[in-house]
Design a protein with these regions (language model features):
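Conserved structural position within tetratricopeptide repeats
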Residues: 40-41, 71-75, 108-109
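Alpha-helical segment of the N-proximal tetratricopeptide repeat
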Residues: 10-42
Length: 114
């Protein structure tokens, strides 16, 4: 039995995302970004990886990169509420209130099933 089976992980990309989550939780966002980029290389349509990448980029004060990561997640899944919400929060931090409100409202609609 290999490590992926032992951890009940479906793919190497999922394993890499879990590693990234652990690094992000300890504040090592640069390492998390590296894991996430590897996960995306393995599975280019992994919306959760793009969203977590955006979160880490935000923590590293790379706001434009974070927005681009959320946009990639949303191109894959336009109904991914977490990406809409996180994008809205960054836009709000950047003073882009109108765009932020639109994104956050979209996320609320999706969370509520509207």
């Amino acid at each position: 039995m290999d490590v992926y089976e032992m951890l009940n992980i479906k793919s190497e990309a999922e394993y890499l995302v879990r590693q990234a989550q652990g690094k992000a939780m300890t504040g090592d966002h640069n390492a998390a970004v590296n894991y996430l980029k590897k996960a995306i290389d393995k599975e280019p349509r992994y919306t959760e990886a793009y969203t977590l990448l955006g979160n880490c980029q935000d923590c590293l004060d790379k706001k434009e990169d974070a927005i681009a990561s959320y946009d990639k997640a949303l191109r894959i899944d336009p109904d991914y509420a977490d990406a809409w919400f996180n994008k809205g929060m960054i836009l709000k931090k950047m003073g882009r209130s109108k765009e932020a409100t639109e994104c956050i409202e979209k996320s609320i609609d999706l969370y509520c099933g509207r």
